[in-house]
Amino acid sequence: MQAFLADNPVLQNILDMAAIIIPLSMLFAFCGICILTVSGEILGMRRRRSFYGKCAMQLSMLGQGLGWTLLVGGRVWLYFLEQDIPSGSILIMFHEISWMVLGLSVIFSCIYFLLWKTLAPYPGIHIGLGVICALQSVLALLLVLACLRTLAVVNLPLAEETTPLQVLMPVWGTEYATSLCYIPFLMLAMPAAFGCVWLLLRRQKDDFGRDHYNTVIPWCAAWARNAWAIVWLLLLAASVLELSPLLQGGTLETADAVTAGIRVLLWLIPVLLWFMAARSATPLRHKASLTVSLVLSCLFMLPFFMGLSSWAPLP
């Protein structure tokens, strides 16, 4: 297999990018989905409409699939990864702790989903359980990202006095600091992006009526649009900060400006597509645009990871 991939570098690059994009997209979607489901439950209670509660249950089911896939896939990945790390290394302990915390998040999410009907007469208790699940998921996300950061940086030529805290601490103006700014908004946008497509796929299985999907798909699309708009504004600000010194110094190349412009415009597309779906009276007809939005938002994981794994020593 390795010889085959060595003879096909394009395929090797595609697989390498997919190995970053797919797990990271699923991780953000899973770790943020409880925030979305709890919001749906609260909104359903306030508006006295069952649409949002049913949508929250559908999204919680999606969370089960994402969570267990991440947990099993992460265990397999760690098995092969740790074979190349000396036994007793602190990295192994860090990896195992991150995986166990992720496992706790999956278990809490499973309990939250399984007790949905049992705790239906006690919505406050169920919402409280969802809040605990959401907090646990946020902790799991931060630990896993810290683990990925450490794993990416540890093999770089670091100074001997570099500490783990320095590896994790951001430096203003670096790609790593910018990536950290994206995290809370990606955690809100990705579950909604997955949720829009998931609701389309569940249309036949969960026949709650056309009015249900005409209500909840625009709600998910609006959630994704708002969160992704902030991601895009952060990207725009980062691009301006990156190009301003070059422009002032007269060293800005046309290729750099074009690349930055394409990057900014590319990830504006999901905002526009979600905006149209959120405002549409017939959101079920937006299957293609919602799918394209999901794909583009997943592709953003690649530059995000590159920023997360970049290294700039503390001044």
Positions of the model-derived regions?
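Alpha-helical transmembrane segments and their helix-start/interface "positive-inside/aromatic belt" motifs
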Residues: 14-22, 51-64, 120-141, 215-225, ...
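Final/C-terminal transmembrane alpha-helix of multipass membrane proteins
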Residues: 290-311
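Membrane-interface transmembrane-helix boundary segments in multi-pass integral membrane proteins
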Residues: 175-179, 249-266, 292-293, 312-315
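Membrane-interface helix-loop-helix junctions at boundaries between adjacent transmembrane segments
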Residues: 86-181
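Hydrophobic cores of alpha-helical transmembrane segments in multi-pass inner/ER membrane proteins
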Residues: 25-37, 100-115, 181-199, 263-276
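N-terminal signal-anchor module of multipass membrane proteins
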Residues: 1-58, 62-63, 67, 310-314
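Membrane-interface helix-loop-helix modules in multi-pass inner-membrane proteins
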Residues: 64-130, 233-271
